[in-house]
Amino acid sequence: MKYFAELKRSMNFLAQDSRTVFLGQAVSVAGTAMSNTLKEVPSDRLIELPVAEEMQMGMTTGFALTGLVPVSIFPRWNFLLLAINQLVNHLDKIQVMSNGGYKTKAIIRTGIGSQRPLHPQHQHVGDFTEAIRMMCSTIEVIRLEEPKDVFPAYEWALLRDDGRSTIVVEYGDYYGEK
């Protein structure tokens, strides 16, 4: 069982559900390591977006409100930080603000950038998992430490029946190391 293979298997599993749509930068074109895990996902399920993180999170919330399960891909934490307003004040709070009337189940995929073979500097390798856990009251944050953790996390994120969103945090270095 390899980390990258499990990520690919997870994306293919998610794509089998007619409610899922994948959106973000470099989802339908090469550009990030995450792009390589989406190669077998049907192209009509991939929505390529410009670098506009807050817009992407707003679209994610909108798709979730319609009953879709968006898989919103932010290649590293530093991209997701730019969508923090939409994440914390909208996606995370809609269920609470509507007294349970609206559920916004989304899967947010992000990563801790690779440090090897060359360290790209702190902007790309930050891990904000704990900070986001403290900011969000309804979104679960799962960090994928081992290959055996990958598929169950994505399966849970899709099949959970509580209407909650899940942020799944990957390690860039593990794509080729584990």
What are these regions (language model features)?
Residues 1-178:
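Thiamine diphosphate
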